[in-house]
């Protein structure tokens, strides 16, 4: 028979341990270590991971602790796109923020979460702020908010332009020494940051007020970055209106300094002692001023002096005459501009409390609420005007926020020891699961609820009303372990079960459980990753992907669950490398481990042997890098060619004709290498379980077009033949050609 040729120029089918070595495709392989197969026509030795930076503190917990995020502002407050890396220091219960981790990395900030060590820190980043919590439930650790705040602040005479680290608590005003008064505002240090003073008068002269004649109570709130409103604190004072009365000369006074996350606040009103809804009375914005309701376009700006501020509009009159110890002030005709209740400032006007116009006695004279302290003829006085509020607003606390102010609690930063074990942001809401949180509406009881998912109102990523929850599989013997989202689908993983929930509708009453999948759960958040193709996850029994178009697909279908490398998956973490569309699965994050690489383009697996030398963190990626923490070193995955110890075992070739014997003559390998080393070649004959030695020699240095010819005549006749190659070096194999003759005899037991 003439010579025949079997050419193998593509190994992109990757690893296949599911089927018999004879039955797999020619482009598939039976065993591989440290060879990349994702480029058709090339098979090359892989590169090891490389160091990006090192940790200053102790390494993160297994499968937890690192997070990549980007900001438009650098740590030094310079406006420029920057990337940052959050690293957990579990010994000191801190998070180190590393700027420019892939350029010139530098530890620039530390976030302090408390005093309980050994935390499992998880993160989410949205609206320019990083949120951190201890999924391990450290009793003395508290959820944190870290973000850049840039805001003008006429209320305090200066702007905020800085990164802020704050407890992630949406605390209500303390309210100490803040009140509803009609004696003028005189802010003191005791008012600092605890709330808002409201100064007002009741108009009894006009008859066009729209308020019900009754006694009213008031409450105040803080508004935080992201327009997230706190619960309410009531004022001790009340105000009574008679028929047709209304409020006039309404001012807001405040004293710095507030938590930098607070951007303003609101004041509400309702009938005293009633269950009526709290109606908006004043909307306060530190940057723009105060308005009386959302429909009002005009803000009354703040004036600030020595850290105190009040809202107003104002005008001056340079014709005023004052007399020491006398409350009467004369002036030229002002055409009725000066009105009772106006706040008056100027030389000779008392300031504690601030004087107001108590009555206008004529076109050229008015009475102060207190005697002047100096005689001036003339003197310029400034008259400050507040709001006139003739009727109630249509806006209420519930209509603004979507929940009642009587909800009780709304944030994980409210108390140390509150936590969640997993988090994702989906359709403008934050979802957290397996929570230690307030049990129910209005309750202060904290309970661990492993079957509960909590979620925020739209756009309010730190606000968690206790009544906005999903309970699935209560007391089913499983806990929620991971959440991930894709589009408007929420994937909620328990230990063994996956729930897919449709959260498309803005109305949470229209959400529904789309499907339930048993046997597809995971053990931790780091076992799940979002990619451009969908959500991927790894568990001991397989590696899977879900997308809206294809549903659930087992990526590891060609890998036998009862054989290595699948049996080596014991504590997996998963990452994604966008540049080459690779999944990186490290099989055991708790010890030295091999890794699997899945290529989405070729739909193939390869294995990287001895990839990690110790326990690692979770895996993170940006568009260019995929990183993890190995000890105190941050390492990055590389898909490039490199020098390493590699193994390749081909399929068991029957040359397309298993029923006849073949006599192999030679093997021709086309390759390239920058430095030739010894490559050991072995063969398996007719499905033997143990290899026989074939050749061990140097494959010479060849930048291009290297050829290695290996004599096969000594093998004798075969029904099938498989090859194994091992080496430590930097090689690229382009193709293999087996030269053989068909003998024409049928194989028999013991035949050579």
Positions of predicted regions on the chain:
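Surface-exposed extracellular loop regions of Gram-negative outer-membrane beta-barrel proteins
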Residues: 490-517
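Hydrophobic or amphipathic alpha-helical targeting/insertion segments
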Residues: 112-183, 270-289
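N-terminal beta-propeller domains
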Residues: 1-103, 160-195, 200, 219-236, ...
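Surface-exposed loop/turn elements that mediate protein-protein interactions on large endomembrane-trafficking
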Residues: 94-103, 140-154, 444-470, 502-509, ...
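Conserved aromatic anchor
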Residues: 200-211, 246-263
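Beta-strand signatures of extracellular beta-sandwich domains
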Residues: 219, 266-268, 343, 680-682
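Small/polar beta-strand repeat architecture
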Residues: 254-264, 271-280, 285-416
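Beta-sheet repeat architectures centered on beta-propellers
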Residues: 1-108, 113-121, 126-128, 215-217, ...
